[in-house]
Structure formats: C-alpha cells, structure tokens
C-alpha cells in the first residue's frame, strides 16, 4: 500500500463509521456503510498476494449484497411510510430485510461463511480491524432501530451465531480463524441482549474490542498465526507466555477475568426478562469455546521449560521496542472484573 494513501484510506474508514453512527437518516447511514466498505478493501490487500485478493473479493461481494438488500428495504419502507428516519419502520418485511442485511455485514450466522475466510486471508493487523472496527457501524444502526426489530428473528440469529462460533473453532489450527469464530460468538452475545438492554450491548462491544485487540497484538508481536508457531513462544518472547493464556481465557469468559463480566450481565438481563432457556443454552455452548481455548493454552504450556528444546533460543537476540499499549490492555483484559461492583450503583 502506498504510504501516502494510508491517511486517506483510514480517515475514510473513520468518517464512514462516524457518519453511520451519528445519522438518523437512512440514506446517510447507507452512504457511511458504503464509504466504510470501499475504503476497507485496500486494507485487506495491504500485502498483495492471491490469498489477500481472494479475501478482498469475498468481502466485497458479501458486503455489496448486504448493501443492496439494505437499500431495497429502505426504499420499500420509504414507499410505504414516506419517511427516511431510521427509527420509523412500519413494514415488517422491511424490518426483516434490514435485520438480514445488518446480520450479513456483522457476519452473524447463518451469514457467517465469509468471516473466517476473509480473516485468514489477510494480515493480523487487518484482521484486527475487520473483527473490531468494522462491527461498529452495523451495531450502531441496530442500536437505533432495536425498538422496531423482530425480537424472535434477532434471537434466532444470536443463538445460531453462538453455536456456530463455538462449534466452528473446534477443528481449527489457524489462530486467525479461531479468533474469527470467537468474533461470531461474541456478536451473538451482543445482539441477544439488544432488545432488552442496549446499554449492555455497548458495554459488551467495548469489552470485546479490548480483549480482541489484546489477543491480536500479542499474536502479532509473537508472529504466531498457527497453533504450531504459538507453541514455540518460549523460544521467542518468554514474557508473552502468561499474557496469551490469560487473554484467551478472558475471551472464553472464565471468571475471575474481565471476559466473564459481559456474559454475566447478559445472562442476568435475559433471566430478568423471563427467557430462561436462551441464557441456559448460551452458557452451555460457551463451554465449547473454553475447550478450544484450553487446547491452545495446553499447546503453549507443554513447551515450557524444562520440556522445551532450548537449543535455539531467539529471545536473547530480539530487539523489541517497549510499548505501553499492550501492558495497559492486558490489565484491562484480566483485572476489570474485581472492580466491577464499583461501576454499578448500589441497590
């Protein structure tokens, strides 16, 4: 990528997300989504190779299809209601089409097929942006229209996403695909509570971005893209060994780490609203996530001293620049749950 073009591309991505999130007019929201999509394609092809080109084409085809469905729903709703306001959806078919288009853009099941492939075909930094920043615009639209959404359809998408994200990561050895399936699961948790308490959705999204950013930065620093490369962490950067397992366990929602807090709030809110079966299913399926995270941790731990081969130690020769971002994110990833009672008002 041309260094001169990078500020233009990233500023366009930021502007597109900001326009969509702050707009109450359907056309402006749609324009923001299109700006975001078109500017993100060069980010996916940062390294020009057939795999990244394939990932960019898949991303474009899915996002363009979702945009066409969204525009069709917007126009049909405008013909029936005469309004362009995002919160004024009078036709249930338009509501269903809008929800379907947003689910495609978020990569929710059953429209999830593109997320692991696109994430695998790009770099770790581009994959981080795909799984974090690119979620903001569609979720901001969902946040605005949640009072008029079909709750049953949304919960169906959410439960399917949690199940597919958990089962899909079981047979993976590529870390980017595992994090992509983890993203599908987390999006399911975010949207499941949206009709009942959208503020918990925003909190869940914030925690998810912190956890995923920590995981991607650690893997990028370690140059690990597969389970095999992750198992050689001892020979490269020894100080990452406690960081990566704690981050993965937090992503899985294991107490007392930070990742347990949003799941706890979602289950509590769903239980308050009388939906006991749904949070039970969600909690049980999440154990599958913990299983394949534990498998990654096991593959890393068995290479610790003295069982590892210490003949070729690389960490003595690594000249790493110190950074404050990763330690700060690690603290937020692991230690936010103990201070959670301080953030909620007393009953």
From Swiss-Prot:
Reactions catalysed, as given in the entry: a ubiquinone + NADH + 5 H(+)(in) = a ubiquinol + NAD(+) + 4 H(+)(out)
Keywords: Electron transport, Membrane, Mitochondrion, Mitochondrion inner membrane, NAD, Respiratory chain, Translocase, Transmembrane, Transmembrane helix, Transport, Ubiquinone
InterPro entries found in the cross-reference section: Complex_I_Subunit_2, NADH_DH_su2_C, NADH_UbQ_OxRdtase_chain2, ND/Mrp_TM
Presence of keyword Membrane: yes
Enzyme nomenclature, EC number: 7.1.1.2
GO cellular component: a single term: mitochondrial inner membrane
GO MF annotation list: NADH dehydrogenase (ubiquinone) activity
Biological processes per GO annotation: mitochondrial electron transport, NADH to ubiquinone; mitochondrial respiratory chain complex I assembly
Subcellular location as annotated: Mitochondrion inner membrane
Annotated membrane topology: Multi-pass membrane protein
Transmembrane spans: 1-21, 25-45, 55-75, 96-116, 123-143, 145-165, 178-198, 199-219, 237-257, 274-294, 324-344
UniProt superkingdom: Eukaryota
Function: Core subunit of the mitochondrial membrane respiratory chain NADH dehydrogenase (Complex I) which catalyzes electron transfer from NADH through the respiratory chain, using ubiquinone as an electron acceptor. Essential for the catalytic activity and assembly of complex I.
Subunit field text: Core subunit of respiratory chain NADH dehydrogenase (Complex I) which is composed of 45 different subunits. Interacts with TMEM242.
Family classification: Belongs to the complex I subunit 2 family.
Entry protein name: NADH-ubiquinone oxidoreductase chain 2
Gene source species: Symphalangus syndactylus (Siamang)
Gene assigned in the entry: MT-ND2
């Amino acid at each position: 990528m041309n260094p001169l073009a990078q500020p233009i591309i990233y500023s366009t991505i930021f502007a597109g997300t900001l326009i969509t999130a702050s707009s109450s007019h359907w056309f402006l929201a749609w324009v923001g989504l299109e700006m975001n999509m078109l500017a993100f394609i060069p980010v996916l092809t940062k390294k020009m190779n057939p795999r990244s080109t394939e990932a960019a084409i898949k991303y474009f085809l899915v996002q363009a299809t979702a945009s066409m469905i969204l525009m069709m729903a917007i126009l049909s709703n405008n013909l029936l209601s005469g309004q362009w306001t995002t919160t004024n959806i009078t036709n249930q078919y338009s509501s269903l089409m809008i929800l379907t288009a947003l689910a495609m853009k978020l990569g929710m099941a059953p429209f999830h097929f593109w997320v692991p492939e696109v994430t695998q075909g790009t770099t770790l930094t581009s994959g981080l942006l795909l799984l974090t920043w690119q979620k903001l615009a569609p979720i901001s639209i969902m946040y605005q229209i949640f009072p008029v959404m079909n709750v049953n359809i949304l919960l169906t998408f959410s439960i399917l996403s949690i199940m597919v994200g958990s089962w899909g990561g079981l047979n993976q050895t590529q870390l980017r695909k595992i994090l992509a399936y983890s993203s599908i699961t987390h999006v399911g948790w975010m949207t499941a509570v949206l009709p009942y308490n959208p503020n918990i959705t925003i909190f869940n999204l914030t925690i998810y971005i912190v956890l995923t950013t920590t995981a991607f930065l650690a893997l990028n620093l370690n140059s690990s893209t597969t389970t095999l490369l992750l198992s050689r962490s001892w020979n490269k950067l020894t100080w990452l060994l406690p960081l990566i397992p704690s981050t993965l366990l937090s992503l899985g929602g294991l107490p007392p780490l930070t990742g347990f807090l949003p799941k706890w709030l979602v289950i509590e809110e769903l239980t308050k609203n009388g939906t006991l079966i749904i949070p039970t299913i969600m909690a049980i399926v999440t154990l599958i996530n913990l299983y394949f995270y534990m498998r990654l941790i096991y593959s890393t731990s068995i290479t610790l001293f003295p069982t590892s081969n210490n003949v070729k130690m690389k960490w003595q020769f690594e000249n790493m620049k110190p950074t404050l971002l990763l330690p700060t994110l690690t603290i937020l990833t692991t230690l936010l749950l103990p201070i959670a009672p301080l953030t909620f008002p007393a009953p």
